[in-house]
Design a protein with these regions (language model features):
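A cross-kingdom feature that marks ATP-driven nucleic-acid transaction machinery
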Residues: 1-23, 33, 47, 56, ...
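Interdomain motor-coupling "hinge/lid" segment immediately C-terminal to the ATP-binding subdomain
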Residues: 2-16, 130, 136-246
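Hydrophobic anchor at the beta1->P-loop junction of P-loop NTPases
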Residues: 42
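Short glycine-rich substrate-engagement loop in P-loop NTPases that contacts/grips substrate
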Residues: 65-94
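Conserved P-loop NTPase "ATPase switch" module shared by AAA+ and STAND
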Residues: 91-109
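Structural recognition of the conserved hydrophobic beta-strand(s) that form the central parallel beta-sheet
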Residues: 99, 124-130, 150
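Accessory nucleic acid-recognition modules appended to NTPase machines
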Residues: 208-346
Length: 398
């Protein structure tokens, strides 16, 4: 009887989430997931909207479906109940889709996910996780069965669609490179992208603006600190006494990025070893707090990155607005939007080398390609020409 009541409580929470009126932005990732897979993971930065995305999945694919159940593993119930035991009961009572939020809050999650996959052949599990969780890299039992997707912050396209009630589609990099004039002309006939661009750079990447834009920076700072305290520190088994050093390193990065790191100087300033600084950089990159740029694209654990960038422009405004310049905003935006689905390396002839083929200079309205065959991503132009492409248009890649 007690188990029945607990299960009903979880069902009530599930129903309440579906019934709540809330603002949301439909993410195109919904259409990129292969829903035939039985074990699907959604990773993303703290506060990027993973829980909202899971609720959107329920609303779109499982509304009024009693064989689907959402549970948050932050619930104290799962301190005494194993996932596999719960899934067994759910499965035997007709359950078909189990949505597990915050899988990283549960110990031995990988073994139990594998057990659920093996023991319940008609059960689909969709779970969310911290971006630093090495779901496949450190769990051989999941490599062949789990499909992992990353929920990124809003693209400029998604933000623009919401603000203007449009439905602009995303384009591949190749489509933009070969047809950017026609694409840009079609968009600017409907809206003025540059009228929304600066707002996006400041407070449009994360969905917090949907609820209360006035507290955007405070909300983002809270999630940055939680990411350092939990995603970076706890999940990488770093003692909390070293958290001040992580915070100091992030402040240095935010105040100087993009920059070529002098690891010896930084290690002296943070008062830790060079090897520790390299580890911290990698951890923060995995947490989607910073981006690292390498000449060969190989993020070797012992190789110093050529350049360090903040992951997105909103983080720059939240941590150290005084460091911001137009040049920094432009380059950070380009790396963030293009790098989500394309490989970016440093270039000895331009700012970035994309997919080992395309060299890009990123700058203001008068920016030109370094030489013939190269490209320029130019700010403050609506429509480009030849190999000069509007910077804002690279926000339409996802």
């Amino acid at each position: 009887m007690h188990k029945i009541l607990l299960m009903q409580n979880l069902v009530n929470i599930h129903n309440t989430l579906l019934e709540q009126s809330r603002k949301t932005i439909r993410r195109d990732l919904m259409d990129e997931i292969n829903w035939d897979d039985r074990l699907i993971g959604i990773k993303g930065f703290r506060g990027v909207g993973k829980t909202t995305f899971l609720i959107d999945i329920m609303n779109e694919k499982y509304v009024n479906d009693k064989s689907c159940l959402y549970v948050n593993l932050n619930n104290f119930y799962f301190t005494k109940r194993k996932i596999i035991s719960f899934a067994d009961e759910f499965y035997k009572t007709g359950g078909k889709t189990l949505i597990l939020d915050q899988i990283h809050k549960y110990p031995d999650w990988a073994t139990e996910l594998k057990g659920c996959y093996t023991n319940f052949p008609d059960l689909k599990i969709i779970f969310s996780a911290s971006p630093v969780l090495r779901v496949l890299e450190e769990n051989n039992e999941l490599k062949e069965i789990a499909k992992i997707y990353h929920l990124e912050g809003l693209s400029f396209r998604e933000y623009l669609n919401y603000q203007t009630n449009q439905n602009f589609k995303q384009y591949t990099l190749q489509e933009i490179l070969t047809n950017h004039i026609n694409i840009a002309q079609e968009i600017v006939q409907a809206v003025k992208p540059l009228a929304f661009f600066n707002d996006y750079l400041k407070d449009g990447f994360y969905p917090y603006f949907l609820d209360n834009k006035s507290y955007y920076s405070e909300t983002l700072l809270k999630h940055i600190n939680l990411a350092l305290e939990i995603d970076v520190t706890y999940l990488n088994q770093i003692d909390l006494q070293y958290l001040p050093k992580l915070r100091k390193l992030l402040q240095i990065i935010a105040s100087q990025s993009p920059f070529s790191p002098n690891v010896s100087k930084i290690s002296a300033e943070v008062q830790t070893s060079r090897a520790t600084i390299m580890n911290y950089l990698r951890y923060m990159k995995n947490a989607r707090i910073i981006n690292l740029l390498f000449s060969n694209g190989n993020e070797d654990e012992i190789k110093k990155p050529d350049m360090v960038y903040m992951h997105n422009t909103n983080l720059m405004y939240a941590i150290d607005e005084g460091n911001i310049t137009s040049k920094i905003l432009r380059q950070t935006f380009f790396y963030n939007q293009v790098g989500y689905k394309n490989q970016i390396k440093s270039s000895d002839k331009a700012n970035f080398l994309v997919n080992d083929i395309y060299h890009f200079n990123v700058g203001g309205k008068y920016t030109l390609p370094f030489e013939e065959g190269y490209f320029a991503a130019a700010d403050m132009i609506e429509v480009g020409n030849a190999n000069i492409i509007p910077l804002w248009l690279f926000g339409f890649l996802y």
